[in-house]
Amino acid sequence: MSEKTIFAEKLEGFVKSLKDHVSSSDGQWTVKGFIDIFKNVYTISSDTKIVSKILEIHLFPKILKFAQDNGYKVVLAEHQNYYPDISFVKAADESVRFAVDFKTTYRNPIKPYLCNGFTLGSHGEYFENRASTKNIQFPYGSYSGHFCLGIIYDRADGATIDETKSHNIAELQAITSVAKNFQFFVTEKWKIASDKGGSGNTANIGSINNIADILAGRGMFSKLGEHWFDEYWMNYKKI
């Protein structure tokens, strides 16, 4: 088996353990908020960026252990806008690297078979020029594979969350979590890419948003292969 196949299989096995790490028995996120020295608990916002960052912090000890158990070093992105979030570098052969990006999104409450979607990194300089070091930890072409570690969840009903209220730590169990019903997945990013750009004005690759297709890796390029994904996005809106 190739290094990429071995890494992918181990990462897939690891991801199956993460739901229990972040969830209570009823599916609620075990993170309830943040605490001050007076033991007051403040509810966190349901803003996706905040939830995503706290989930990363929550999962990081597990990520580190996974890397150590499998002979990899973890290199974090040096800057906030760098790709990827985590580079796994093989300790015995540092030329073997895998890019892993955290992707967090929530289910559509009206159409729960859909999620809000997410971006899959830039199709700009470092994607077009695979030797470039602009906004990327290592050159894109030096990675043996590019993976998404994805998290899909339900947002709590806004009526049950009061961000203006603080709680005593004794009330911890009664605080409604801002997220619940987590679903974790891992896939190579090209397998869940769409043919449309991500949100905003940045040059980002957009994902598909059907949850079943995301979990099965059935994106726009899944039958064509990674080469066609690369060709399409390297030439996006240029032809």
Q: What is the predicted function of each stretch?
A:
Residues 1-77, 81, 91-98, 104-239:
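Nucleic-acid endonuclease domains
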Residues 84-85:
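Internal alpha-helical scaffold/solenoid segments in large eukaryotic proteins
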